[in-house]
């Protein structure tokens, strides 16, 4: 079960323990704590990462697992998508000691039973407001992906359909079924 606490400052967030297995994010100053992902969640994230990593060979993007993105200082927002895609120039411009600033071009979240709809929706809104071109929300039980884009539009892709990244790069497609193949 996700735990949402009261308001937290950026300085207090940076002082939280690391390496204890808990997943922490801050959305508009509210700390969200989730238990570590279970194997199905991790496997789907791994498949998404592996499939998208083929785009790195084209030199256009970098693909990350659980990278941290600092969206704002006040109120603090820091999000760690399961998988994210950044344009190569943004990835290269970030020092190895810093968080990425702003949202990734594509953020991918695998829904966990412990994640509340409220927290998930706030995270999607924050990512889009921070500049994401799309947020893919993967629903393992339904075997579908909900795609959110700026302007309040969303649509669903199911097995037998394709996911696309028009801006990253044009012409690339991913069969939804590849995220769920055993």
Residue ranges and their predicted role:
Residues 1-182:
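Gly/Pro/Ser/Thr-rich low-complexity, intrinsically disordered segments predominantly at protein N-termini
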